[in-house]
Amino acid sequence: MYKRVLLKLSGEVLSGEDQKGFNEEHVEYLIKEIKGISEYGTKLGIVIGAGNIFRGRDFEGLRPTISDQIGMLGTVINALYLKDRFENAGIRTVIVSQIVTLPSVKLINYDDIDLYFDAGYVVIFAGGTSNPFFTTDTGAALRAVEMKAELLIKGTKVCGIYDKDPKKYSDAKKYNVITYDEAIEKNLKIMDTEAFSICKRYNMKILVMNFFENGNLLKAIKGENVGTLVVPKV
């Protein structure tokens, strides 16, 4: 059983693929999955992307720094939305960020993070790394290390990591466990380079799994065989 976990989700978890805004069915599913682990006492941090709010690639003419700042603010919007929905469902939630302080958003202080966890809060990390040119994957890797997580879960639409695209190749092989060095050698795109290097440097386990399969989050927390686990060595 993992006691301290960082969950990284894309904004599409809230909206559906290639959609904008919030899809009620998807949000209710997320709430159900989070509630499903609440009785086990796992301290949970969440990093959510902003693809359902804003994608810089959809807008030509924006400077990358401005595009990235809009994306960071998009993660704050998602965090505020989730906090309200979570709390309406009985999930105590706090938002922390390095870029925005609002009545419902606290400035990151890692002494306080431990207090929030001990009090039973889910902690949503908003605003990415607070710097442009870094993805929310990198933000998730940083927050996972900073909150002393035992596992970083990357919730996706696929069942794990494959040797080739399973949508294109029927003989694609799924890895149950793979090392960092193997993943680099095989050029498997698990996270962006910066995020992956942070996890490798600090021996952070990464679990890539299908978030949309009922009960997978609880299975992951329990350490059951789900998705693909990336480890320092086997």
Curated annotation (Swiss-Prot):
The record lists ATP as bound by K8, L9, S10, G11, G51, R55, T156, Y162, D165
Q: Does the keyword Ribosomal protein apply?
A: no
Explain what switches its activity on or off, per the activity regulation comment. Inhibited by UTP.
User: Which residues take part in binding UMP?
Assistant: D68, T129, S130, N131, P132, F133, F134, T135, T136
> Keyword Metal-binding on this protein?
no
Q: Which GO terms describe its cellular component?
A: cytoplasm
EC assignment: the record states 2.7.4.22
Q: Which SUPFAM superfamilies match?
A: Carbamate kinase-like
What Gene Ontology biological process does one annotation of this record name?
Answer: 'de novo' CTP biosynthetic process
InterPro entries documented for this protein: AceGlu_kinase-like_sf, Asp/Glu/Uridylate_kinase, Uridylate_kinase, Uridylate_kinase_bac
Q: Which pathway is this protein engaged in?
A: Pyrimidine metabolism; CTP biosynthesis via de novo pathway; UDP from UMP (UMPK route): step 1/1
Q: What family does the entry list? A: Belongs to the UMP kinase family.
What protein is this chain from?
A: Uridylate kinase
Classification from the root reads:
Bacteria, Thermotogati, Thermotogota, Thermotogae, Thermotogales
